Design a protein with these regions (language model features):
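Active-site-proximal, substrate-binding regions of enzyme catalytic domains
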Residues: 1-187
């Protein structure tokens, strides 16, 4: 899991670095959709190493945005729901209803919390910092299931085996949303 997370961070970092290595090389707007783990990395919930990598990504974006804002960061409604569930589990841990498992982010969130209101404060701080310090907001689109999105929908491509794996389903759903935003066309 740790190696996969590092790999994902490196892919994001390399992709941005390649596209904006030369100032002005980004000719069109680029919106990057971040998942829960990357958002936790930015905030520091997954430790200093991941936070440094995530902040390097923001430095690259800031450099690319020096002339005009081309790079934006967003997260999907489903990602927000995943984060909200994570914080709800943290509340259950603070209440003593669930045991704390070996999860770096969960430990960071629950550390020092005496009651549920402490978790609520941390959740509010998390979303506030994402928006006002980093400009990361939830995607504004109301739905990804309009009739006009049918051709770009990749969710129907699940194999029977993949339909059983919730993580694969979630990943394909997010990729499908991005494909719909791009109208089934590559970025480059």
């Amino acid at each position: 899991e740790y190696l996969n997370s590092v790999r994902e961070e490196v892919i994001l970092y390399t992709g941005l670095n390649y596209n904006i290595d030369e100032i002005g090389s980004l000719k069109r707007d680029l919106t990057l959709y971040l998942d829960m783990e990357v958002l936790f990395d930015i905030y520091g919930y997954n430790g200093e190493v991941f936070q440094r990598l995530a902040l390097d990504l923001f430095k690259l974006a800031r450099d690319a945005n020096s002339k005009e804002k081309r790079v934006r960061f967003r997260y999907f409604e489903e990602t927000k729901a995943e984060i909200d569930l994570f914080f709800a589990k943290a509340e259950e841990i603070v209440k003593g209803k669930v045991l704390l498992k070996d999860n770096v982010a969960m430990k960071a969130i629950t550390n020092g919390c005496q009651d549920v209101s402490d978790i609520s404060d941390r959740k509010a701080d998390f979303y506030t910092k994402l928006q006002y310090s980093y400009g990361i907001i939830q995607d504004e689109r109301a739905s990804y299931y309009y009739k006009s999105d049918t051709d770009a929908n990749l969710e129907w491509t699940f194999s029977e085996e993949e339909k059983k794996d919730l993580e694969v389903q979630f990943a394909v759903k997010m990729i499908s949303h991005i494909n719909k935003l791009r109208n089934n066309k590559p970025f480059y």
